């Protein structure tokens, strides 16, 4: 009995809460719009789809366009630590970073050297992952993964399986990141690999089987503070009182039901599946609904850039999303974004999942307005007002 009590106390003592500070950086998409290069990139994407029309069909990761992320975090892998910059992505589930055999498109990337890590365990199984924009391939390995930069307080997760890329597509070539850290469920992961955070929960490393995300407003310069991911607890420093929880309709993505979208005179009350996605800098939804919201805001669609331009001084009112019995209102400061050169964008895009999965992506404009609480253990999402400084 004494042994059992001692083990229980030790177990409680080992569980913890970790805060992972992130930085904001202008997305590749926004940079290309600002410099007039985005139409050429869109043409490249159209040509890619024309050559391989079935490549993106029915893929669980096709929600992701990694030209569209804006918030980045540091991780380390191995013993001693090797550092990497990654997208912290709730819209996918796999962790991968480049390895030393990745040459094309990897010249500016940090690469994981398995021979330099005393805790590395060879797996050898090959893997390939295809996103809505971009792909990567290589072999799997196992090592200790730590959330946070070297020298910071880190969440350390031993025996974590991850991808070591020998090839990445040109989509990732000029990104400010080395790889992707997926935070969604194992059921979404390629090859059924247990994601690092799920692995931490399975090992009892966290106080609670959840994490919360607070995103700051978009920065005025790259590499400034962008927010905090809190693992194992709700962030009560940067987030207000919980509004409500909403059960997940699918524990793959963080997918749940929304019952309406409204802005000004326009409203749509169809109940749809939506996902919370930290890796998408805009809101994404059906063409007809996004068009209606944009028109109500006074935004105009630009076919050349495939975006909605809006007057930077516009004050159209809140964009209201009904989830459960509550209405969540996004202020214009979070859905009107500066594209440079005196231009601003209505931060939404037409999105078609092809009949599979969610109808809407609730990206950074929603998460900047409301802290999102990813309650993995209870398979539900929670929302609390962001306490922006």
Swiss-Prot record:
Glycosylation-annotated residues: 74
GO BP field: apoptotic process; proteolysis
EC number(s) reported in the record: 3.4.23.-
Residues forming the catalytic site: 89, 277
Tissue: Expressed in intestine, muscles, pharynx and hypodermis.
Keywords: Aspartyl protease, Disulfide bond, Glycoprotein, Hydrolase, Protease, Secreted, Signal
PTM note: Glycosylated. Has phosphorylcholine-substituted oligosaccharide N-glycans.
SS bond list: 102-106, 312-344
GO CC annotations on file: extracellular space; lysosome
UniProt-recorded Gene Ontology molecular function terms: aspartic-type endopeptidase activity
Highest rank taxon of the organism: Eukaryota
UniProt domain Peptidase A1: residue ranges: 71-384
Function in brief: Aspartic protease.
Family: Belongs to the peptidase A1 family.
Official protein name in the record: Aspartic protease 6
Organism of this sequence: Caenorhabditis elegans
Gene this protein is translated from: asp-6
């Amino acid at each position: 009995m004494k042994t059992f009590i001692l083990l229980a106390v030790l177990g409680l003592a080992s569980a913890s809460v970790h805060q992972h500070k992130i930085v904001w950086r202008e997305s590749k998409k926004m940079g290309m719009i600002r410099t007039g290069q985005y139409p050429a990139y869109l043409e490249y994407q159209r040509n890619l789809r024309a050559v391989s029309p079935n490549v993106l069909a029915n893929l669980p990761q096709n929600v992701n366009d990694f030209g569209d992320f804006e918030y980045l975090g540091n991780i380390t892998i191995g013993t001693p630590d090797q550092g990497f910059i990654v997208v912290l992505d709730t819209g996918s589930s796999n962790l991968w970073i480049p390895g030393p055999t990745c040459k094309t498109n990897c010249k500016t990337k940090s690469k994981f050297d398995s021979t330099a890590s005393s805790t590395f365990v060879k797996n050898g199984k090959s893997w390939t992952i295809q996103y809505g924009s971009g792909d990567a391939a290589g072999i799997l390995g196992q090592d200790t993964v730590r959330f946070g930069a070297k020298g910071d307080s880190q969440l350390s997760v031993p025996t974590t399986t991850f991808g070591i890329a020998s090839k990445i597509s040109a989509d990732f070539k000029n990104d400010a990141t080395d790889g992707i850290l997926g935070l969604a469920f194992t059921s979404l992961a390629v090859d059924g690999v247990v994601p690092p955070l799920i692995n931490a929960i399975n090992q009892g490393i966290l106080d609670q089987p959840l994490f919360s995300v607070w995103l700051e407003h978009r920065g005025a310069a790259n590499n400034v503070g962008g927010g905090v991911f809190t693992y194992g607890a709700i962030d009560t420093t940067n987030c207000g009182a919980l509004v409500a929880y909403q059960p997940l309709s699918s524990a793959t993505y963080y997918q749940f039901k929304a019952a309406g979208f409204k802005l000004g005179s326009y409203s749509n009350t169809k109940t749809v599946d939506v996902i919370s996605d930290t890796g998408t800098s805009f809101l994404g939804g059906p063409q007809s609904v996004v068009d209606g919201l944009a028109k109500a805001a006074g935004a105009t669609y630009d076919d050349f850039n495939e975006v909605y331009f809006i007057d930077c001084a516009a004050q159209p009112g809140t964009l209201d999303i009904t989830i459960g019995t509550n209405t969540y209102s996004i202020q214009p400061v979070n859905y009107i974004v500066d594209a440079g050169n005196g231009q601003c964008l209505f931060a939404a895009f037409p999105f078609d999942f092809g009949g599979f999965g969610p109808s809407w992506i609730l990206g950074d404009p929603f998460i900047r307005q409301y802290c999102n609480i990813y309650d993995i253990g209870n398979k539900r999402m929670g929302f609390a007002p962001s306490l922006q400084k």
